[in-house]
């Protein structure tokens, strides 16, 4: 059973999210005024990418070295709902060029996360102390207020020790270096419920900026993982909540995931988070462990108690995200991080200053990132800084625009879906473009085909009824047999050797025989090899010859003429075998070689001109998994034949056109279990009965059972005695007679 992770709060005495001096939430703070001075700046295309500031704190000068950190995509939108309940994007403009993170010169364990949009606003973290900085609004100069943030310790533990999901005490700890050569990206959608929206500002611009600060802090903490958290979109429930936000975090997470799967289809995102405000709460968060990239479980709930700092809220979010990547809580006796408090230590919520991931967390992340469960972190979103003003009517969808059909394009559909002067939806329209938007500017019904399968390794997608955009383009899982079991599917294409030959030489060509490959690819010259190195042609090992240069059979009498290439002919065993040779460095040179994923033997495929075992494809879709009536898609979900229903193609429905839980025509809310059980971590001690209280209960039950047995036995004995007495009496009477 998957683990549902809950974070116990105990945060009733932490500082408020936005107020620098909330009564009773912090130690006495010394607020001072400082004037930051910009001393260096590096620009690119008209905007700053690196900047250095000098400022004084308590009379001492510190140097802040900052680098621009983008986390907003160009199509970032903030959504809310109008009076009719229809979700609309808010007309706000956001800058993606003024968010920076860096360090304090001379302090290796320091961290700075600030926005420079309107002055400096953010957090400065030393080893064990944090400072908040923000512009002094009443000042005509560049004055800022700076104050020390010192959250008090909570009166209670953050977790019940018996419930804590710590790693095995025998867990082997190794020193893991961050994988800085590989970048990872996580796209999240954040929903702010009504009370949370009112608590942190009650204004769309103010709340949006605070969420930006939250993501900035989160990204700074995740820097050792080389992970960038992208805020793909933001949603405000300003008038009413779309789901009930009462109850414990377990049930709230279930409701949110159910709502997410039915209604949250805005744009591609990997995880969705619901931020909920409560005066007091036993828990501060919930998520599923290790399920970050599972669409059905990729979500979390963060409960924001009345008194909590922005720093602590960022730690809550980071811990939830880490848990969803399978990163466990630290054993403080064996895990180290170089700073007083590590990120995955529950006490991190109570501390100030820099918090880093421990060696244990780094190893957990390293294991997760090489597993199939991390596939959603591999795609890189476009993060071009949005510093240009949007121009309505230029035909480009820019920041703040819902649609832009150009100078003449708005007349294509009667009536026009897009207002050409505002680049917003026209009155009465619910969509403008996309394959799931009909001619009357309304969303197509759920289940209408929007992307047919283009070949046997592709699958169909349908409109989901809530978005004008067709579902993500899914395809058959890599490794599935195709072309009459001769080849396999790779990235949605049947990797057929015969088709490679036809693509290169025309319809008169076919895939070469083993004799052709063995003969030509053993020569290590222009006619055949396993690639080219700086020293010449690469030799093919006998087992790799089917993966070297592409060798085809040619069945026409016409002479082949290829532009910029030499065609090599060879008569081998009565077959005309041909290959191709481009000049070194030619843009088409890859076509000379057999493609990766081409079958080269039983259970083997080509990879980098070598014939290797196909186990690296991780193909595990047996016919039994989909009950012989479907195939697995690239999410490893069954895509069922017509009339057979997902998720396992076992049940049937006559009108079902086929598909999977990802196709857009399936009610995916059913995939969430009706009940989730808290298996570990952060459960209140008062929520369960101690064992010593249960023992007397069982003793009483046993005593009652014993008494009932004794009474029953006694009554039975009395009946036997009465029966014996009556028999004796009757016997005596008969003898007298």
Swiss-Prot record:
Report TM segments.
689-709
**What sequence ranges are listed for the domain Peptidase M12B?**
184-381
Keyword Transmembrane helix among UniProt keywords: yes
Q: Which residues form the Disintegrin domain?
A: 389-478
UniProt's post-translational modification comment states: The prodomain and the metalloprotease domain are cleaved during the epididymal maturation of the spermatozoa.
- Oligomeric and partner information: Heterodimer with ADAM1/fertilin subunit alpha.
Which protein, by its recorded name, is this?
Disintegrin and metalloproteinase domain-containing protein 2
Originating organism: Rattus norvegicus (Rat)
Could you tell me the gene encoding this protein?
Adam2
């Amino acid at each position: 059973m998957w683990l549902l992770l809950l974070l116990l709060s105990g945060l009733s005495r932490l500082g408020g999210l936005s107020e620098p001096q909330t009564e009773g939430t912090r130690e006495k703070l010394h607020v001072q005024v400082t004037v930051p001075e910009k001393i260096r700046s590096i620009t690119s295309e008209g905007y700053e990418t690196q900047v250095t500031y000098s400022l004084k704190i308590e009379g001492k000068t510190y140097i802040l070295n900052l680098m621009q950190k983008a986390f907003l995509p160009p199509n970032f939108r903030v959504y809310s709902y109008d009076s009719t309940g229809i979700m609309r994007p808010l007309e706000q403009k956001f800058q993606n060029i003024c968010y920076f993170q860096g360090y304090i010169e001379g302090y290796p364990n320091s961290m700075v996360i600030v926005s420079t949009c309107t002055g400096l606003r953010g957090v400065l973290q030393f080893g064990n102390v944090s400072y908040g900085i923000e512009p002094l609004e009443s000042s005509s100069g560049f004055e800022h207020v700076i104050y020390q943030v010192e959250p008090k310790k909570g009166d209670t533990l953050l977790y019940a020790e018996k419930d804590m999901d710590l790693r095995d005490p025998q867990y082997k700890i190794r020193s893991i270096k961050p994988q800085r050569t590989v970048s990872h990206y996580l796209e999240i959608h954040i929903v702010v419920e009504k009370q949370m929206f009112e608590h942190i500002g009650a204004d769309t611009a103010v709340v949006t900026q605070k969420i930006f600060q939250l993501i900035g802090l989160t990204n700074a903490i995740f820097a050792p993982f080389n992970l960038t958290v992208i805020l793909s979109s933001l949603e405000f429930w300003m008038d009413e909540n779309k789901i009930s936000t009462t109850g414990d975090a377990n049930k709230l997470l279930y409701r949110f995931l159910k709502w997410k799967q039915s209604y949250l289809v805005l744009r591609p995102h990997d995880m969705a988070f619901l931020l909920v405000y409560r005066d007091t709460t036993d828990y501060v968060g919930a998520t599923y462990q290790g399920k970050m990239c599972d669409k059905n479980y990729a979500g979390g709930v963060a409960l924001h108690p009345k008194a909590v700092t922005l720093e602590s809220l960022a730690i809550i979010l980071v811990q939830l995200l880490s848990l969803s990547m399978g990163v466990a809580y630290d054993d403080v006796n064996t895990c180290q991080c170089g700073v007083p408090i590590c990120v995955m230590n529950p006490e991190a919520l109570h501390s100030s200053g820099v918090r880093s991931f421990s060696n244990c967390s780094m190893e957990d992340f390293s294991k997760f990132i090489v597993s199939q469960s991390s596939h959603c972190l591999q795609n890189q979103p476009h993060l071009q800084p949005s510093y240009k003003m949007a121009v309505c009517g230029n035909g480009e969808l820019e920041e703040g625009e819902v649609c832009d059909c150009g100078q003449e394009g708005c007349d294509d559909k009667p009536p026009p879906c897009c207002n050409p002067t505002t680049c917003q939806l026209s009155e009465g329209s619910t969509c403008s473009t996309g394959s799931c938007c009909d001619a009357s500017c309304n969303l197509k019904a759920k289940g209408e085909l929007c992307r047919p399968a283009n070949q046997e390794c592709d699958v169909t997608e349908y409109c989901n009824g809530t978005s004008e955009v067709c579902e993500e383009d899914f395809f058959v899982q890599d490794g599935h047999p195709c072309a009459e079991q001769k080849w396999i599917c790779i990235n949605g294409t049947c990797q057929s050797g015969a088709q490679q030959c036809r693509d290169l030489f025309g319809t008169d060509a076919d895939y070469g025989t083993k004799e052709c490959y063995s003969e030509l690819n053993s020569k290590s010259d222009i006619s055949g090899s396993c690639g080219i190195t700086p020293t010449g042609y690469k030799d093919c090992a006998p087992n790799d010859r089917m993966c070297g240069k592409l060798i085809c059979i040619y069945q026409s009498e016409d002479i082949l003429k290829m532009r910029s290439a030499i065609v090599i002919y060879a008569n081998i065993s009565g077959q005309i075998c041909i290959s191709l040779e481009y000049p070194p460095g030619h843009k088409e040179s890859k076509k000379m070689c057999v493609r990766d994923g081409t079958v080269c033997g039983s259970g083997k495929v080509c990879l980098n001109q070598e014939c290797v075992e196909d186990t690296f494809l991780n193909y595990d879709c047996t016919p039994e998994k989909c009950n012989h009536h479907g195939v697995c898609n690239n999410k490893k979900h069954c895509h069922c034949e017509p009339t057979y229903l997902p998720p396992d193609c076992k049940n049937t429905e006559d009108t079902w056109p086929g598909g999977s839980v990802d196709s857009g025509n399936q009610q995916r809310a059913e995939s969430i279990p009706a009940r989730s059980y808290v298996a570990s971590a952060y459960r209140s001690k008062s929520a369960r009965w101690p064992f010593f209280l249960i023992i007397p209960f069982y003793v009483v039950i046993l005593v009652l059972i014993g008494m009932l047995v004794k009474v029953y036995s006694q009554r039975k004995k009395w009946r036997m005695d009465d029966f014996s007495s009556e028999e004796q009496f009757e016997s005596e009477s008969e003898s007298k007679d």
